[in-house]
Curated annotation (Swiss-Prot):
Keywords: DNA-directed RNA polymerase, Nucleotidyltransferase, Transcription, Transferase. The gene is rpoA. It is an enzyme of class 2 (transferase). HAMAP family: RNApol_bact_RpoA. This is DNA-directed RNA polymerase subunit alpha. The N-terminal domain is essential for RNAP assembly and basal transcription, whereas the C-terminal domain is involved in interaction with transcriptional regulators and with upstream promoter elements. Residues 248-334 are annotated as: Alpha C-terminal domain (alpha-CTD). It comes from Thioalkalivibrio sulfidiphilus (strain HL-EbGR7). The keyword Transcription applies.
Length: 334
C-alpha cells in the first residue's frame, strides 16, 4: 500500500454490535498510531456531557411543602420519591418543556407507567418504580419536564431562575444525559505490512431514549463542529474582521438623538461630531467638559441616561467605527 509521507490513514472499517437494546460496541479501524486515544477520549467526554436529553426538573406533590417529610400511606419518604423520579427515562419530541400528572390510590406499586402522558412525550421505562402505597395510601403529583445537556444541579438553576417560587414546588438535580456508561480501549491493528496501527473499541450503555450508534454520530458531529473553528483560522482576514464586527452591541450604532437628551446637550455633542452612542461612550468626562457650552449639569444628564442603558463614559471599543458608519454620516449631513 503506497501512501504519501504526509497523508494520514483514515479509518475504513466501522462495526456496530448491539449487545442488548441499551448496550452496544463500536469498533473503528484502522487509525494512525496515537489517534485511538485521541479520538476515544474526546468522544467519551462528549458522550457523557453533551448529548441532549430530557429529565424531570420539578415536582409538586399534593400535601407536601418540602422534601424533608413523609406522606401518610406511602412507604418511601419524599426524598426517596424524588430520587426515583430522576430514574425515569424520557423522550420529548419537538418541545423543550412539558407538565405531566400522576394520580394513584393504594394498595400497590406506583410506576412511571402510571404517569398521564402529554402529546410528544414518551416514557421508555414504564416499569420503573416510583413509590409503594399501602391500602389507604394515595399519591398525586405534578411533574415538570425539561430538555438539556449533561448534569444540572439545583443550585445552578436557582441562580438563573426567579426566586418567586411557590411553596411546595420541589426542584430536582437533573441528569439530562441519555448515556449511562462509556468506556473505550485501544487495540493493535494491522494494515498490510504496517503493524503499528490503532483499533478503537467504544462500549456504551444508554437509558433507552437514544440508540447507541446515533449517540456516537451525535458526539462525532459535535466534535467536528467544535474543531471547525480551528480550521477556519486558515481563512482570510475578512472572515476574522466580520466576526469581530458582529460583536458590537446594536445600541452603540444608534444615534445620540435616541437618548432623548435636552436640546442643549444634543447640540453640544453634534458640534463635537458625536453622532452615535458608540462615539459618546468613548469620551471621558474631562473631554466632554471641554466642549463649549456643555457644563456639569449637562454632563450629569448624559451620564444618567447612559447608566440607564448599562453604559458609562470612558469605555473603549475595538474596531470602532465599523466600516460604512461614517459613510452614513456623510450622506446624512449632505
Amino acid at each position: 500500500m503506497q501512501t504519501k509521507v504526509n497523508e494520514l490513514l483514515k479509518p475504513r472499517h466501522i462495526e456496530v454490535t448491539s449487545v442488548s437494546d441499551r448496550q452496544a460496541k463500536v469498533v473503528l479501524e484502522p487509525l494512525e498510531r496515537g489517534f485511538g486515544h485521541t479520538l476515544g477520549n474526546a468522544l467519551r467526554r462528549i458522550l457523557l456531557s453533551s448529548i441532549p436529553g430530557a429529565a424531570v426538573v420539578e415536582a409538586e406533590i399534593e400535601g407536601v411543602l418540602h422534601e424533608y417529610t413523609s406522606i401518610e400511606g406511602v412507604q418511601e419518604d419524599v426524598v426517596d420519591i424524588l430520587l426515583n423520579l430522576k430514574g425515569i427515562a424520557l423522550r420529548m419530541h419537538n418541545r423543550d418543556e412539558a407538565t405531566l400528572t400522576l394520580k394513584k390510590k393504594g394498595p400497590g406499586v406506583v410506576t412511571a407507567g402510571d404517569i398521564t402522558l402529554d402529546h410528544d412525550v414518551e416514557i421508555v421505562n414504564p416499569e420503573h418504580v416510583i413509590a409503594h402505597l399501602t391500602k389507604n395510601g394515595e399519591l398525586s403529583m405534578s411533574l415538570k419536564l425539561g430538555r438539556g445537556r449533561g448534569y444540572q444541579p439545583v443550585t445552578a438553576r436557582r441562580s438563573s431562575e426567579s426566586e418567586d417560587r411557590p411553596i411546595g414546588r420541589l426542584m430536582l438535580d437533573a441528569s439530562f444525559s441519555p448515556i449511562r456508561r462509556v468506556a473505550y480501549k485501544v487495540e493493535s491493528a494491522r494494515v498490510e505490512q504496517r503493524t503499528d496501527m490503532d483499533r478503537l473499541v467504544i462500549e456504551l450503555e444508554t437509558n433507552g431514549t437514544v440508540e447507541a450508534d446515533d449517540a456516537i454520530r451525535q458526539a462525532a458531529g459535535i466534535l467536528q463542529s467544535q474543531l471547525a473553528a480551528f480550521v477556519e483560522l486558515q481563512g482570510d482576514e475578512s472572515t476574522v474582521t466580520e466576526s469581530k464586527q458582529m460583536e458590537i452591541d446594536p445600541i452603540l450604532l444608534r444615534p445620540v438623538d435616541d437618548l432623548e437628551l435636552t436640546v442643549r446637550s444634543a447640540n453640544c455633542l453634534k458640534a463635537e461630531n458625536i453622532y452615535y452612542i458608540g462615539d459618546l461612550i468613548q469620551r471621558t468626562e474631562v473631554e466632554l467638559l471641554k466642549t463649549p457650552n456643555l457644563g456639569k449639569k449637562s454632563l450629569t444628564e448624559i451620564k444618567d441616561v447612559l447608566a440607564s442603558h448599562g453604559l458609562s463614559m470612558g469605555m473603549r471599543l475595538e474596531n470602532w467605527p465599523p466600516p460604512g458608519l461614517k459613510d452614513q454620516d456623510k450622506k446624512a449631513s449632505g
